[in-house]
Amino acid sequence: VCVLEAEADLIPELRASTFHPPTLDMLDKLGITPKLIEQGLITPKLQYRDLEEGLIAEFDHSIIRDHTDHPYRLQCEQFKLTRVVEDLLEEYSNAEILYSSKFVSASQTDDKVVISYDTSTGRNNIECDYLIGTDGSRSAVRKSQDIEFKGFTYPEQFVTVSVPEEIDSIVTNMGHVSYISHPTEWCALIHAPDYWRFLFPIEMEMSKEEAFKDEFIQKRLQKIAPYKGKYTIQLRTLYGVNQRVAESYRLGRILLAGDSAHVNNPLGGMGMNGGIHDGVNLSEKLIAIYNNGGSEDLLDLYDRQRRPIAIEYVQAQTIRNKKNLEERDPNIRKQRQDELRAITD
C-alpha cells in the first residue's frame, strides 16, 4: 500500500471530532480505538435544546449497550486519528506514505493503474493494481475520471469557534454535545478534550473579515451561553457546506471513498464516520480479492452497499437535522419538540 499525501506532513487542523459507536467498534478491531480513547472525551449523552426554551430532550447512549462495545460518542479530533494510523503503518514493511506528493492524473488498463504525481523534484509515475481516491471534497482523483459529484450547496456559510471556557459551568445542565434550535441562530455545541466548539450559520454574503470580528463572535456566543466575561477565542474557521454524492464509487480499477465520494453538513457527525465505514468495507473487498481469490465484482458490491447508504441515510439524515434546527414554523417546531420529549420519557 502506498499513500500519496500532497502536504509535507499530517495536517494539524481539528476538522471532525466525533466517533460514533459503530465506528469505534470497527476501529477497535485494528487496535485504534484504545489509542483514541486515551486522547478523547467519552460522551454518553446527547442533548436537543432550544435557544429560548432550554433543554428539550436528552438521549443516553447506554440504552444501546447490548448492541455495541462502545455505547457512547467519543469526542476526539480527526488529526489525532491520522497520527495513530501513521504510527501503526510504520509496523508494516509493505506500507508507506509519500509526503509532498501531489496527485496529477491517472490512466488505467485491464490490469493496472498508472498514476502521475508531482514532488519538489518533478513529475513521477507509479503503477498499482488499484487507486483509491480519498483526497477530499475537491478530489483530483474524482475529477480526473470525470465522475459527477451531484447535489447542492447551502445558501449560507458555517462558522466554528473554539473556546477554553467550561460551558457546562456557565449554562446549567448543558450537555457535552448539544444541538440548539432557533429559526436563524441555531447552534451545535460540542465539548472536545481541550475546548468547547460552537458551530453556527451566517449569511453567504458576509465576508470572512466580518464573520471573524471579535464583536460579532462574542455577541453570538453570549446569546447561546450568556457569560459574565469575554470568551477566549482560540480558533475560528469559516467554510461553505455541500450535500453531494459521486455518481459512482467505482470506475474500473479506480475507486472513491470518504469525502471524495460524498460530503454532507456536519450536523450529526457523519462525514468522517462514513468515510471510515467506506474504508473498512472496501478493504474487506480487496482482502478477499488478494487473499481468497475473490472476484473483482466485489468492487461493484462496494459501490452498491456504500453509495445507497450515503444517499438514503447520511444525506437524508443530515439534511433533516439541519431543517429541524432551523425550523421557522412554530407549530412544526413544537411538534418536533413534543416528539423528542415523548421518545425520551
Descriptions of predicted regions:
Residues 239-256, 260-262, 311:
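FAD-binding beta-loop-beta segment adjacent to the flavin cofactor pocket
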Residues 1-16:
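Glycine-rich FAD pyrophosphate-binding loop
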Residues 90-104:
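A conserved beta-strand/loop element that lines the FAD pocket in flavoprotein oxidoreductases
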Residues 247, 285-345:
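C-terminal helical "tail/cap" subdomain of flavin- and related membrane-associated enzymes
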Residues 86-87, 110-114, 124, 130, ...:
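Conserved FAD-binding catalytic core of PHBH/FMO-like flavoproteins
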Residues 12-15, 20-90, 181, 190, ...:
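Active-site-adjacent segment of FAD-dependent monooxygenases/related oxidoreductases
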Residues 99-101, 117, 235-237:
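Short loop/edge segments at beta-strand edges and connector loops
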Residues 186, 240-243, 262-273, 308:
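Glycine-rich phosphate/pyrophosphate-binding beta-alpha loops
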